[in-house]
């Protein structure tokens, strides 16, 4: 059994570690709040843009639109856009995205497609660069804002748009972590390009907020408030042709979709870090209890031994 000083030193070390993990949990919680505020600030533009496109869609058929972003072509080359974080200590967040990327890469390779990677986040970059003989990396981005901004999305959007328009790739898929709850964040695969020729699919949207219950953080999600007021009157006449409008608006729409994916991935990373640090704090608390019990037993044994020695010496 370790001596009393070693046990006492380890108890102090565990308690100090718990203070660090608890502080990291609180910092992650504050950043989740910032992510929430960023989503709310970007929502008006995103909603208005989607509704403008819906208005244009109602006046024409997207199938007849002469926009390269809507044209599906025979797929020979596929670009996978993988989104991870720059840092660790967030549970299996980065590992799950990397595994899903490798899985998707294998699925497409088995079908005979030529594949390249566009990587966002230092963890994905480091992992795949160390395996550069197996994977082709076209571009990489790191040191993004902890709460992604439109500038972050613009750089990645410009890269994949350039690839798609130059026909260097025939399809772009994004792999990121979809935020569900503090304990459930799943990596998903979605097609970014080409855009759906049937029009803009309006998915149910939600606003998430972080609250506290019983001294613990929880995530609550509410449906985004609906606003059905028409953006454009039915008698509005566009000076530009629908094709010109689409070619101007669709890149903005694509950038907005990528921004929302980055924001959701950031929220997932922060939630994973909160959970990981919370688990670490709980484990440190239990370990400190166990060490205290061990220390008390060792101290009691030492005292008992001293008493026995004193009694034994007195009897002699």
Curated annotation (Swiss-Prot):
One of its GO terms (molecular function) is ATP binding. Disulfide bonds: none annotated. It is found in: Cellular thylakoid membrane. Signal peptide: none annotated. The keyword Iron does not apply. Transmembrane segments: none annotated. It is a peripheral membrane protein. InterPro entries: ATP_synth_F1_ATPase_gsu (IPR035968), ATP_synth_F1_gsu (IPR000131). This is ATP synthase gamma chain. It comes from Prochlorococcus marinus (strain SARG / CCMP1375 / SS120). The lineage of its organism: Bacteria, Bacillati, Cyanobacteriota, Cyanophyceae, Synechococcales.
């Amino acid at each position: 059994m370790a001596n009393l000083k070693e046990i006492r030193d380890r108890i102090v070390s565990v308690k100090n570690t718990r203070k660090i993990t608890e502080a990291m949990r609180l910092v992650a919680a504050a950043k989740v709040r910032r992510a929430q505020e960023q989503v709310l600030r970007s929502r008006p533009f995103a909603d208005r843009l989607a509704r403008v496109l819906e208005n244009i869609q109602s006046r024409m058929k997207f199938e007849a639109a002469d926009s390269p972003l809507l044209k599906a072509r025979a797929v020979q080359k596929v670009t996978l856009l993988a989104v991870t974080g720059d840092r660790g200590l967030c549970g299996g967040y980065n590992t799950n995205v990397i595994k899903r990327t490798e899985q998707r890469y294998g699925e497409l390779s088995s079908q005979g497609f030529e594949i390249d990677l566009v990587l966002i986040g230092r963890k994905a970059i480091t992992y795949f660069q160390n395996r550069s003989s197996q994977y082709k990396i076209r571009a990489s981005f790191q040191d993004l804002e902890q709460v992604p901004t439109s500038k972050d999305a613009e750089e990645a959007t410009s890269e994949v748009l350039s690839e798609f328009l130059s026909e260097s790739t025939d399809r772009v898929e994004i792999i990121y972590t979809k935020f569900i709850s503090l304990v459930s964040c799943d990596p998903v695969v979605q097609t970014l390009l080409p855009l759906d020729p049937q029009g803009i699919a309006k998915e149910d949207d939600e606003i998430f907020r972080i609250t506290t219950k019983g001294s613990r953080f929880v995530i609550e999600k509410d449906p985004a408030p609906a606003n059905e007021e028409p953006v454009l009157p039915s008698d509005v006449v566009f000076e530009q042709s629908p094709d010109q409008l689409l070619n101007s608006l669709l890149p903005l729409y694509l950038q907005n979709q990528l921004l929302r994916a980055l924001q959701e991935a950031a929220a997932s990373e922060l939630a994973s870090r909160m959970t990981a640090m919370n688990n670490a704090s709980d484990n440190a608390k239990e370990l400190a209890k166990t060490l205290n019990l061990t220390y008390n037993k060792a101290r009691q044994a030492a005292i008992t031994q001293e008493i026995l020695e004193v009694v034994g010496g007195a009897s002699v």
